[in-house]
Amino acid sequence: DYYFSLDEGSKLYPSDTTYVHDYAVIDGQRAFIYFRELEEKLPGYEYNAQIKHIENILTKDIYSMPAEKADSIGDDNINATDLWITGEYLNIKYQFYHSNNEDKKHMLNLVINEASTGENDKPDYVNLEFRHNAYNDSQLTLGTGLASFKLDNIAEQLKEKKGLNIRVKSLYDGERFMTIDIKKENN
């Protein structure tokens, strides 16, 4: 048995999975869950649901990028149109141009650039780079998507910082820096 943890902290139990019977559940995988709430209440769950559709969200770790890996990680243009933190994840809504060819895969990463000069770093923030490798795909169609990056491997650094400062090589404005402050719990 499994259940879904929703972003606001509640739990959803999938009582009826008829529509998604072949969905492979992976612990820690973020997804959009389309469901219909069932009337019967289940103890320990805020929602009891019939699952209509599950759409996985690209879910990755933050990568420490040594200088020799910069080429394979890529630095092609991409827009970060929205950033927000949910639980242990940084979510980035993005846009990039592509050919609409399913055989042409792009790669997205959020990296700690070990070769950074520190020139644009903000000392009170964890400095990261949102990287895109288009693998020379033709730039014909503007596409959008969502990626979630686990914050667990920078959790210790974040304790001493105000938030994140993220470098993005944008589609239209060149290099941009976006900051997101992290709300600290007062103990």
Indicate where each model-derived feature is located.
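First exposed extracellular module after export/assembly in secreted or surface-exposed proteins
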Residues: 1-187
